[in-house]
Amino acid sequence: NESHQLALTAFGAPQEHYQRSGSGAALTMSEWNNVRKYMKDGMHFSRYNPTYGYDDYGNQNSANYNVYHKPQISLNHIWQIDHKSSLSTTAYVSLGRGYGRTAEPGLNSSYSYTDLTYGANYGTLSHTFRREDGTFDYGAVEFANSPNNPIYDPNSDQFEKMYAGSQLVICENRNDHNWYGLTSTYTNKFADVLDFYAGIDVRYYQGKHNATISDLLGGEYFIDATRAKVKGVNNAAALDPMWQYEKLTIGDIAYRNYDGFVVQEGAYAQLEYNQNNWSAFVNGSINYNHYWKVDYFYYDAEKGKSEVLGFLGGTIKAGANYEFNKHHNAFINVGYISRAPNLDYGAFMNAS
């Protein structure tokens, strides 16, 4: 049909790589100069990663590693209504799967969270687990976590040896989302000098966020210190000491487990004017955002769903441009923007 075009598109680019944590791994200028001694000939010191290293068997490891794949499938339809107007509509789905590694200290751990997560602390390189060549010593972490290196019970008069599991582990902070959406744009050329655009944008997003233990780093189990922060009034499981001190292993979830939901509806319109040396536009948009969460860690099934928060936003913008010649022009733009806050650290106090 000459008036209709239909296209199905699918693409994705899986990626995985080591990474350096942002502000947490930041070093002072003098400290960056100090790490030059660790770099091989020809390698710039800015490529130094404080958490990249090896275990005692030469296996590479890093508490900062990222794996993600976010393929998108879209169905596009273009309808040429007449010689002046058209309607373009796209329905799409995006299924993101992946994680970024982070470190987590265990119950009564004497090791700093920043030592393993960032390899640095307040701009200074951490040497708690540092080899002479500057790489991170995961072998030393594994020894510290092993049953062969027990700590002493501070509550015992005899200071009996006790084993409290891994004092540091690596978790995969997972972000698995399903995102569905539809956009549609109507275009009409009212006259030789006027173009009109209007459209809608509807989206639904569900993101599953948890921290899955992926490496016990030489230990036999892990006791999640975060469980002590869970209130029994919110989650009845917290009333059971066996739950608070449960011995977790690879594949178990620690310190966070929730789903985030976002529903967005929006509409917009724009009118453009072009004649001789003048061009101008005026546009407006309106949107409404619905946010809610379902928490499975800090709350039980009856209390896990939050209230649904709604935010109305929109924009009004206008502008004009005058072209004096091909080298010079003058323009002015004015506008007002109102936007909804982000889901995490905005609509809700924190990400967990």
Give short role names for the model-derived ranges.
Residues 189-195, 201-205, 218, 233-243, ...:
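Structural signature of Gram-negative outer-membrane beta-barrels, strongest in the C-terminal barrel
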Residues 22-40, 104-114, 212-223, 228, ...:
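Flexible, surface-exposed loop regions and adjacent strand-edge segments
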Residues 1-20, 67-106, 174-211, 311-326, ...:
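Transmembrane beta-barrel strand/turn architecture of Gram-negative outer membrane proteins
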Residues 1, 58-63, 72-76, 167-172, ...:
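Extracellular loop and loop/strand-boundary signature of outer-membrane beta-barrel proteins
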